[in-house]
């Protein structure tokens, strides 16, 4: 159920590390941790807030109390750093989850929505052993990838593109055309297992 303040997006405030990463600051790309204030109660962070694992609601809930930044209805968490320009690359170890979404989202997207279900988030989803790109709850299949141990994400803010990357071949698997209107943050959703993020990486040569 939505709370009375559910639409007060302009009141959002991030943690102490929350800032915009600009092109001049991104030689090594975005460096981030996961922001526990945004994490749904079914999610728990680990390994210095770089990993997230799924648990039944009430079994291993986040220790953060309900607040304006927290996702209320879906198992979503955002990173603690935003991007406003430049090209950025990070990787996600996905081998321990069978159902997840990874991508980016506007920092002020509705906390009653799930990433990929609205037009303010852009993600790649994995479920039932199949990959899809997602925007506004519309799915497009991505074939020939399987479930690798790790995948990369390449964000080009000015070109408004988000790409899924094969980390072994260092090649783009699929690209989403986006419509960024403001700061975006890496975004993650999962319904089993765990995801581990790897940031502060240089954009690989050839991408």
From Swiss-Prot:
Keywords in alphabetical order, please: Acetylation
B30.2/SPRY domain location, by residue? 12-207
**Entry-linked Pfam families:** SPRY
Q: Which residues carry this modification: N6-succinyllysine?
A: 139
Can you name a GO cellular component term? nucleus
Using the record's annotations, give every residue carrying the modification N6-acetyllysine.
53, 130
Q: Tell me yes or no: is Acetylation among this UniProt entry's keywords.
A: yes
Q: Which SUPFAM superfamilies match?
A: Concanavalin A-like lectins/glucanases
Cited InterPro entries: B30.2/SPRY, B30.2/SPRY_sf, Butyrophylin_SPRY, ConA-like_dom_sf, E3_ligase_FN3/SPRY, SPRY_dom
Q: Which domain of life is it from?
A: Eukaryota
Protein's UniProt name: SPRY domain-containing protein 4
Give the organism the record lists. Rattus norvegicus
């Amino acid at each position: 159920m939505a709370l009375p303040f559910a639409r007060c997006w302009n009141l959002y405030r991030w943690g102490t590390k929350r800032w915009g990463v600009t092109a001049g600051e991104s030689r090594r790309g975005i460096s981030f941790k996961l922001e526990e204030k945004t994490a749904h109660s079914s999610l728990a962070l680990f390994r210095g807030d770089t990993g997230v694992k799924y648990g039944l609601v009430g079994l291993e809930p986040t220790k953060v109390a309900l607040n304006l930044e927290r996702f209320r209805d879906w198992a979503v968490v955002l990173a603690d750093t935003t991007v406003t320009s430049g090209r950025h690359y990070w990787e996600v170890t996905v081998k321990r989850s069978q159902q997840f979404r990874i991508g980016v989202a506007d920092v002020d997207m509705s906390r009653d929505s799930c990433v990929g279900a609205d037009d303010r988030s852009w993600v790649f989803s994995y479920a039932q052993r199949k990959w899809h790109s997602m925007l506004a709850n519309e799915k497009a299949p991505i074939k020939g990838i399987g479930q690798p141990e790790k995948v990369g994400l390449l964000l080009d803010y000015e070109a408004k593109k988000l790409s899924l990357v094969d980390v072994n071949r260092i090649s783009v698997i699929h690209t989403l055309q986006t419509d960024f209107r403001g700061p975006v943050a890496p975004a993650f959703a999962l319904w089993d297992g765990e995801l581990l993020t790897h940031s502060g990486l240089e954009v690989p040569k050839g991408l």
